Amino acid sequence: MNITNCTTDASMVVRPKTVTEKMLICMTLVIITTLTMLLNSAVIMAICTTKKLHQPANYLICSLAVTDLLVAVLVMPLSIMYIVMDSWRLGYFICEVWLSVDMTCCTCSILHLCVIALDRYWAITNAIEYARKRTAKRAGLMILTVWTISIFISMPPLFWRSHRQLSPPPSQCTIQHDHVIYTIYSTFGAFYIPLTLILILYYRIYHAAKSLYQKRGSSRHLSNRSTDSQNSFASCKLTQTFCVSDFSTSDPTTEFEKIHASIRIPPFDNDLDHPGERQQISSTRERKAARILGLILGAFILSWLPFFIKELIVGLSIYTVSSEVGDFLTWLGYVNSLINPLLYTSFNEDFKLAFKKLIRCREHT
């Protein structure tokens, strides 16, 4: 997402890059781009080829992977060329298309994270009712909404840009906007509002999970103290222990449906009679949940917050940054498209099995 204000200043003029510097930068960015393509392609293939992953929650993950793949295929390569050559050599029309695709795809990737957080929040706090509403059609509508909002956020500059062919062709490809209202509209719509919503949702998700752990531990303790209760539940099907990885990655609905559907929970391990042991297990799960949520939020904030702070202060003419700083912060945001497939699938056993299956298939071919 390259929305740098076109303010120039003599103090911001920097020396040209040496050949060695250009090679190192090019190699680094090519590696990032290649890994982003491979990882997101693997997520898409895993979901498409694994029937067990055909769930509405995973459709959102798949759509996120498609969006991040578009960033890697359509945006990153031209950015590498632009940075290495120190000038834009593809003409005005390609510049316009590239900038529009860049803004749309990056905004869409961010909004996908917001929608995924919202889906998980509904699945955890209102599991039984939301399970009936959580359909492929609903996931499709959420994805369509995300793309629509992204287009409305990124397209307005097209209406006030000059559409005449420049002669000679432009040597710089940056969105030039002096519209303060649009700067505020785009930065808040693409990042600050989604960030606020994501923080609120994951905060509530964590507390819902923490409360659930405590309730399950308390229920087990009560059931273990009653022999009659044990006998009365002997014929009941044992529900599985809630797994942090399910809640933190793909589809937590199933476990929460089981938990919320059962007012009374059958006894599990009799060696958990001591309150200290139960509290220790609960605390371990809470810490694991906190770590996973911390990774998700931390990666998102570290990737995009510096860029959008820069965009706000530059767009409001508070400060001007060099092209090197702008490029670094832009690519820091792009790296989020590399991190997303790792964070949103690595903690889920179904995805791990699907990836292993894909690797085995490639080895046999």
Curated annotation (Swiss-Prot):
CDD domains: 7tmA_5-HT1E. Gene3D superfamilies: Rhodopsin 7-helix transmembrane proteins. It comes from the Eukaryota. Disulfide bonds join 95-173. Residues 48-59, 119-138, 203-291, 348-365 are cytoplasmic. A motif (DRY motif) lies at residues 119-121. GO terms for biological process: adenylate cyclase-activating adrenergic receptor signaling pathway; adenylate cyclase-inhibiting G protein-coupled receptor signaling pathway; positive regulation of MAPK cascade. The keyword Nucleotidyltransferase does not apply. It is a multi-pass membrane protein. Ergotamine binds at residues 102, 107, 175. Keywords: Cell membrane, Disulfide bond, G-protein coupled receptor, Glycoprotein, Membrane, Receptor, Transducer, Transmembrane, Transmembrane helix. A motif (NPxxY motif) lies at residues 340-344. This is 5-hydroxytryptamine receptor 1E. It comes from Cavia porcellus (Guinea pig). The gene is 5HT1E.
